[in-house]
Curated annotation (Swiss-Prot):
This is Phenylalanine--tRNA ligase beta subunit. Keywords: Aminoacyl-tRNA synthetase, ATP-binding, Cytoplasm, Ligase, Magnesium, Metal-binding, Nucleotide-binding, Protein biosynthesis, RNA-binding, tRNA-binding. The gene is pheT. It catalyses: tRNA(Phe) + L-phenylalanine + ATP = L-phenylalanyl-tRNA(Phe) + AMP + diphosphate + H(+). Binds 2 magnesium ions per tetramer. It comes from Mesoplasma florum (strain ATCC 33453 / NBRC 100688 / NCTC 11704 / L1). Residues 40-159 form the tRNA-binding domain.
């Protein structure tokens, strides 16, 4: 982004402020000044001349001119330029002049005729060819002005008309300050820094009620990518008014190549000032209906605006010749759009151009700049006296409406910044930035300028306060080391133990990217996390939002390894998932693909299976001291397509969702060329919450334990966990129990029952149990089962 001093002086009184001070100001505010150019030092003795006579010299390419260079003062100038014409105002270098290209002028005799100067093109006096048209690179430049009487300016220095002696600042904008692609935003910043009043010499133009109409349809291909669609109609007059040369120079100083069409140049000016790109169309050349769609051109898909089957505009470029606004145009249709930045960055790459429009379409600007934009466009047209009338802006699509009101306490600001700052000082920092501050006790409520799409939270406000306060004014404080009692971080200790266990079990710890695409995030939202964090300006569609699960990243890593020849893997990852409103959850995900256990020496090869992955989960629960008698596994009948419809379960603890355990769908495995894969993902925050944090060390009996086995029939509809407490109540010596077998035959299957065998362990701390004591407890179990109407085999 380039701003010039003379343009700033339209809005600010810079009479007591040097260029060096402006540069320091911009750098202090976080806008890095990459380059400064002082055009006033590039040339000397350049004046405005009027070509009154032009005669070709026979047999040569030369033309002999009589050029007025002052009141009753003339010079004979010979030139080979192809565009020498009478009654034109040109840039004349007089003898003794020094030009930016290194040339020093002196009188020169050619064919016996003394040439007393030279007509200049812009590339001879300091402008690069990159901002000049092909004609401008070869021809003499002719001066037009809508502000000055050119006859009266003959003999004066060119800068009195062209503003060529300007001083430019090329500013590098960070992505979060894309709002400064509207030059007016930098005016606010500089005014605020120097405590200057902004002079808004805006032309007061009355906006009429809409009398003309047009329909702008959105094709399904683009409707999700469009944020704003606005338009208006402008009546024109005096359309043959030439484009002012001072405006032309300002565009060139701003690194913008002027177009042959002056209306496109005026649109570029308004875009540089407001940030809003414009599509200008001759309203009489469209049939009352436009369509925004996508079309493949030269094998590249581009977003275009069409009238019927004809392309009116390829977004980022100027209007097609057939629909351009020209000097014959009576009514101009102005279309203003804002689209998804990722789509427009793709458009910019496909077009392989960087224009005033593409630079702004592809950045996260305020989507509702149309009012500011049309004010600037209308203001410039009014300066040219080309404005007949203008209708009120009609907005047909307006999707985005950012929340721009945030509150923070003074204490919070002081705590974050580490400075003693008062409410009055904070308010004084935002004098001209269109950020309103109201105060209630010690709470400050900020109503943020809607152009500042980078400010959307308390931390951003604190950073903004620090920026305006001045980073150099925040005194550096050495770190203060305070001794304190070492805290017991149970969560960290458990995670460390968990990591050690999984590594010991042969798992590799992986770290994957926290950002993912929106669609897969919706698909894999197993924990039903609400309000995902979507980036304002992501680098790509694959990195649009913070993930709400670890499973998708785990599966992608397994697929990547399989494609690179590593098909048998065991991975785990511990990471946090995020959402808006401060949501943060710590998850563990582990997965096995191919062989779960491999021992080449003993020829043991065990493929991944549900029993293995569930045993790892049970070990994790045991590490967290979770009471597994309250843990249940429920099949999810509505699993996503990527998950096996039957081999999957939601793991719950007293109806609280701990996590998920599942096998991938065989079709998905086959499509991605991976071996059978089993995944488990759990919520570590919940495990910590339900963990038994009070550990009681039990005395170990020195006496020999005794065991008994019992088998009984149980309906398949009854969960063993629901009867075990009643079955084992009122026992004196039971120390442990374990289900060791489950059996059913054909007849039992018909009756929907199974036989469970449970091993019971008995012992005592103070004596060796007698057979009678063991039998008494066992008899109680039999009676309990009888009460439960359970048949013992």
């Amino acid at each position: 982004m380039i701003i010039t001093r003379k343009w700033l002086e339209k809005y600010l009184d810079l009479s007591n402020i040097t260029n060096e001070q402006i540069s320091v100001c911009l750098n202090s505010l976080g806008f890095e000044v990459e380059q400064e150019i002082d055009y006033s030092k590039l040339n000397t003795k350049l004046v405005i001349g009027h070509i009154e006579e032009s005669d070709p010299i026979e047999g040569t390419k030369l033309k002999k001119t009589k050029t007025r260079i002052g009141e009753n003062k003339y010079a004979t100038i010979l030139s080979t330029s192809r565009n020498i014409e009478e009654d034109k105002f040109a840039i004349v270098a007089l003898p003794g002049a020094k030009l930016a290209n290194g040339l020093e002028l002196e009188n020169r005799e050619i064919l016996g005729i003394l040439s007393e100067g030279m007509f200049c093109g812009f590339n001879e006096i300091g402008l690069p060819n990159s901002v000049l048209t092909e004609d401008e690179q070869q021809d003499v430049y002719y001066i037009d002005s809508i502000y000055k009487n050119m006859d009266e300016m003959v003999g004066r220095e060119i800068s009195e008309v062209l503003n060529f002696d300007d001083y430019t600042f090329e500013v590098d904008l960070t992505l979060n300050r894309s709002d400064a692609l509207a030059a007016k935003q930098l005016v606010k910043e500089i005014a605020n820094y120097f405590d200057l009043k902004i002079n808004n010499n805006e032309h007061k133009v009355k906006f009429e009620k809409p009398t003309e109409s047009i329909t702008i349809d959105l094709n399904k291909k683009v409707e999700d990518e469009v944020n704003t669609v606005s338009h208006t109609f402008i009546g024109l007059k005096n359309t043959n008014t030439p484009f002012d040369s001072s405006h032309d120079v300002w565009l060139k100083h701003s690194n913008v190549k002027s177009a042959q069409n002056k209306f496109e140049n005026i649109a570029n000016m308004a875009t540089l000032i407001s940030g809003q790109p414009f599509i200008l169309i001759d309203a009489d050349k469209v049939n009352g209906e436009l369509t925004l769609t996508k079309q493949t051109i030269d094998e590249k898909e581009l977003i275009v605006l069409k009238s019927g089957n004809s392309i009116v505009n390829i977004l980022g470029l100027k209007t097609e010749d057939k629909f351009k606004v020209t000097e014959e145009t009576v009514t101009m249709l102005v279309v203003m759009l804002n689209l998804d930045q990722i789509s427009m960055r793709k458009q910019q790459r496909n077009l392989n151009v960087s224009t005033v429009d593409t630079q702004r379409y592809a950045k996260p600007l305020n989507p509702n700049l149309y009012d500011q934009g049309i004010d600037e466009l209308v203001s410039i047209l009014d300066e040219y006296k080309m404005l007949e009338d203008v209708q009120k802006v009609v907005t047909t699509v307006q999707k985005q409406n950012y929340d721009n009101v945030y509150s923070i306490t003074l204490e919070k600001v002081q705590d974050i910044l580490g400075i003693e700052i008062t409410v009055e000082e904070i308010i004084s920092l935002f004098r001209t930035l269109d950020i309103e501050i109201s105060v209630k006790k010690s709470e400050l409520t900020f109503t943020v300028d809607k152009n500042r799409t980078d400010l959307y939270g308390k931390n951003d406000l604190c950073e903004e306060i620090a920026r305006l306060y001045g980073y150099d004014n925040i005194i550096e404080q050495p770190l203060e080391y305070v001794s304190f009692k070492k805290t017991k971080n149970l969560d960290k200790k458990l995670k460390d133990k968990l990591s050690d266990y999984l590594v010991g079990a042969g798992f590799n710890n992986i770290k994957t990217y926290s950002l993912t695409d929106i669609e897969s995030n919706k698909t894999w939202n197993l924990f039903k996390v609400k309000d995902p964090v979507v980036l304002m300006s992501p680098l790509s569609i694959q990195r649009e939002t913070f993930r709400n699960n670890l499973s998708k990243s785990m599966i992608d890593t397994i697929i990547f390894n399989a494609n690179n020849g590593n098909k048998s893997v065991k991975f785990f990852e511990m990471a946090d998932i995020f959402a808006l409103n401060g949501f943060r959850q710590s998850n563990l995900c582990f997965g096995v693909s191919g062989e779960a256990i491999t021992d080449s020496l003993s020829q043991v090869h065990i493929k991944s299976n549900y029993a293995y992955i569930s045993s790892i989960l049970m070990s994790v629960l045991d590490l967290y001291k979770v009471d597994v008698t309250n843990v249940t596994f429920e099949v999810n009948d509505k699993a996503i397509d990527e998950i096996h419809p039957y081999i999957n379960a939601t793991v719950k603890y007293k109806n609280k969702k701990i996590g998920f355990i599942y096998k991938l769908n065989p079709a998905f495995e086959q499509a991605n060329k991976i071996y059978p894969t089993f995944i488990c993902e759990v919520n570590l925050n919940l495990l910590l919450e339900i963990a038994d944090k009070v550990h009681v060390t039990s005395e170990i009996s020195k006496f020999q334990k005794s065991t008994r086995d019992i088998s009984f029939e149980l309906s398949n509809d009854v969960n063993f966990d629901t009867i075990v407490k009643a079955m084992l109540k009122d026992l004196n010596y039971l120390t442990n129990y374990k289900v060791i077998d489950k059996y059913s035959d054909e007849q039992m299957d018909k009756e929907n029952i199974s036989s469970l065998t449970v091993k019971l362990s008995f012992n005592s701390l103070d004596h060796q149990l007698t057979e009678k004591e063991i039998n008494d407890d066992f008899e109680k179990i039999l009676n309990n089962l009888k009460e439960l109407k359970v048949k013992v085999r």
